[in-house]
Amino acid sequence: MFATLAAPPMTADEERAVVQQQSGVSDTALDPVWAFVHKYRTQASDANVGLHKARRFGTRQLIRIARRLARWPDDDVYRLLFRNQLCDFLPRTVRDIVHHMLLDVGIVPHGSEGAFQYKPPLRLSAPVVEAGTLAFFDESGKPVLRVPRYDWRTKDPEGASLIPNAHGSFFHNTQQTGLMHSIVQDLETLDEHLLLMGAQGTGKNKIMDQVLELLDRPREYIQMNRDSTVGELLQRAYLEDGQLKYADSPLVRAIRCGRVMVVDEVDKCSASV
């Protein structure tokens, strides 16, 4: 009754055409990334190398990186690819393999290009809120990124109490400001979902709350645990006047009102959830 259609994998030329069509990246910016991806996939197919346990490099990830390079051609491609493959969490030997593959295709970290090609690492001063925008400047005062703040007064007046407020307890440094700059790029400009990974107590929630406070974005929060279920993600039960009632979960409210959804301890719940 039903015809069987076999979809063959894309050729290299077809995949490159899709990436450029979806991102608008130039050939100059894509060439070194494309060379690394081809080399990475070839090495990852060899079980003796050790990359088979690392993160795969799919077309969707390639499009995401290409969109970022199309918007910011001078971005640190080395750090972008290194972070995309979660190399900081890989064994040292596998991390070194990725590092040498990047060097082989001419992708080096900013600050190590050599004479006449030196690009200093981006060092940012504390972000500034001015005229309804959030602005990032480098240490010389040159503007790096400027995004409009969220107009919650007209779009979500009920979410005013959900905007984080650190009450001046957040202190900026170059590393944290650089991380917030990258989060704002992905969250506000490229409209990407984010996964923050790191050791316990490194301030992931603190940094995320500070970003949302600077952007004036209301946020919903939910914390996962090993007993979390799909039903808890959709609605919550509570007792009122002796009656059991159900209300929308923070996830549903975030979707309905267009708020940022922060899911904490996501690694604690089961894979099915």
Enumerate the predicted regions with their spans.
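Conserved nucleotide-binding/hydrolysis micro-motifs of P-loop NTPases
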Residues: 9-15, 201-202, 226-229, 268
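Conserved AAA+ P-loop NTPase core
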Residues: 162-166, 172-173, 221-252
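Alpha-helical lid/collar subdomain of P-loop NTPases
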Residues: 3, 10-181, 190
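Conserved RecA-like P-loop NTPase ATPase core
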Residues: 2, 58, 183, 233, ...
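Conserved beta-strand position immediately N-terminal to the Walker
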Residues: 5, 193-194, 260-261
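Conserved alpha-helical scaffold flanking the Walker A/P-loop in AAA+ ATPase domains
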Residues: 181-186, 239-262
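Walker A/P-loop
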Residues: 191-226
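Conserved AAA+/SF3 P-loop NTPase catalytic/coupling segment centered on the Walker-B
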Residues: 1, 12, 230, 256-273
